[in-house]
Amino acid sequence: MEVYLSEHIAPSAYARLARHFEIVDNFDHPERLAAMVIRRAVVPRAVIAHAPNLKVIAMHGVSRDTIDTAAAAEFGVPVSNVPGLGAPAVAELAVADLLALNRQLKFVNNGLCAGRFDHFGAEEFVCHEMTGRTLGLVGTGNIAHRVADILRAAFDVRVLCWNPRRTAAECAAWGYEQVETLQELFRRSDFVNVSITLCDATRGLINAPVFAAANPELLLVNTSRGGIVNEHDLYVALTTGQIRAAASDVFEHEPPASDDPLIHLDNFIATFHIGGSTYESLERVSNRAVDYVFQYTGVAER
């Protein structure tokens, strides 16, 4: 039996698969596939429809947005995911981004590389401390909770949240104040963390009307999925002073073009989808995904 593996996984998980399956990196013979382990690869209907022996598509993470889930359901192929196991790593990146944005580290580094060393008393390098500020959460899943916990413990931040699927009482139980609109969240927050799933309802969710209402000192971090934040509108917001700075680990089209003006802004930090890239996260997530391969194929590990 063959298992399609789209990208690198933890060596321990790879070894488990290799002992029992032939591992392939292409869809040349979908009829031979018993399972797939997917990180970011696209799995279209055409592949699923021609894979009669496929028992499971095991996501190496949470989001299923690269999978034709309707086709998977039609052909009776479960799509598993691993919520929560990558949250510590992604939350650490989100917090690191906020710290770097607040201290303008990209701007300062670029200035130093250009020969500047005139920071003493220079107004453009002065910022507010993070203690006692307000964090806004777009989404209230595992990553959002982890970000809030870290920032509350370290900086005693107040937390607002936007999640129409939750009640005010549920948010209050977490110690958050629920707001009704994204515009209100962006207006009242000093920092906003985006941690929601990409779907039709969230595509382009954060856009020009939201930025128009924002606190001009706002720092925005997106470690969830590209497409949730409208990148053109974000560029306008960053270059016209609607918000102060932003960071993103994800893009609508990955990789973004090397000449994309957004990624070259001094007040924008871009990373290439590294949120889950810690040894610990990789170990947890990879092995849980492989657990599902064995579970659904019925192969007994030895």
Locate the predicted segments by residue:
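Rossmann-like adenosine-cofactor binding region
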Residues: 45-48, 166-261
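An N-terminal-biased, well-structured beta-alpha scaffold segment characteristic
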Residues: 1-80, 207
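C-terminal helix-to-coil terminal segments
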Residues: 73, 80-93, 101, 107, ...
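N-terminal Rossmann-fold cofactor-binding loop
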Residues: 7, 161-165, 224
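Glycine-rich Rossmann-fold phosphate-binding loop(s) that bind the pyrophosphate
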Residues: 140-141
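NAD(P)-binding Rossmann-fold cofactor-contacting core
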Residues: 154-172
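Short, well-ordered coil/turn residues at beta-beta hairpins
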Residues: 39, 60, 97, 194-198, ...
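Phosphate-binding beta-alpha-beta segment of Rossmann-like dinucleotide-binding domains, i.e.
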Residues: 75, 83-134, 146-154
